[in-house]
Amino acid sequence: MYKRQLFYWSFFVIVVVIDIFYKRYQMNQEENEKELEKDVAIALEDRKKLMIDAVTAISQMLDAKDGYTQQHSKRVAEYSLMIAKSMNKFSDKDYKIIYRSALLHDIGKIAVPDMILNKPGRLTDEEYNIMRKHTVWGGEILKDLEFLPDADKGAIYHHERIDGKGYPYGIKADELPELVRIISAADSLDAMSSNRCYRKQCDKQYIIDEFKKGAGRQFDNEVAHIVISLIEKGELLSEA
């Protein structure tokens, strides 16, 4: 009887000890997993930061390549962000995607010869056809960027129109993502408000009139009216 009790108590103690060690093992494993998850999160954040730095560097390099549109990409990104925030329908994550995609909307111009990109005058038909290809080239460059979904669409479609009369594919409103509609308007806004080799910048009233005429045709109706409102309130083109 005594031996049996001793056996049971010994067995109980062993089980308790094993349980304690197992729980400690689990705790250590959980701590290790948390540390590993933390390390992975830090590594992913570092990778994302490197990607963002690369995006910024590429946009700056692109602006430097095009002598007539210095800081164009940055302005388009800033205008796009202002328009998006005025729409009150996007998340903070969406704002980042819109801003960074806008920074790269003209990345395909890297493949356009400098003699065409910086020509001091209007382009010939042949040169214009080459210039138009920057949209497709940009899409090819950006299509595999996982951290910037739809950035390729911003590059490909930012010269498309709501009425289907744009390029490169002539697609219409229902096929154009909101990101594209925003970037397209911001790109046109900067084009009109900047000095070009063949013309001076347009005044505010002219730009407002162009967005009024283009609403529902060239531009998304909602986006066009937001741009007009921001200009009239002095939140856009305040220095123009």
What name fits each language-model region?
Residues 11-12, 19, 47-48, 102-103, ...:
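Short, flexible segments with low predicted structural confidence
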Residues 52, 56-240:
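Metal-dependent catalytic cores of enzymes that make or break cyclic nucleotides
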Residues 7-42:
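Juxtamembrane or sensor-core-proximal signal-transducing alpha helices
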Residues 1-5:
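Conserved small/polar residues in nucleotide/adenosyl-binding loops
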Residues 33, 37-44, 51, 61-66:
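Signal-transmission coiled-coils
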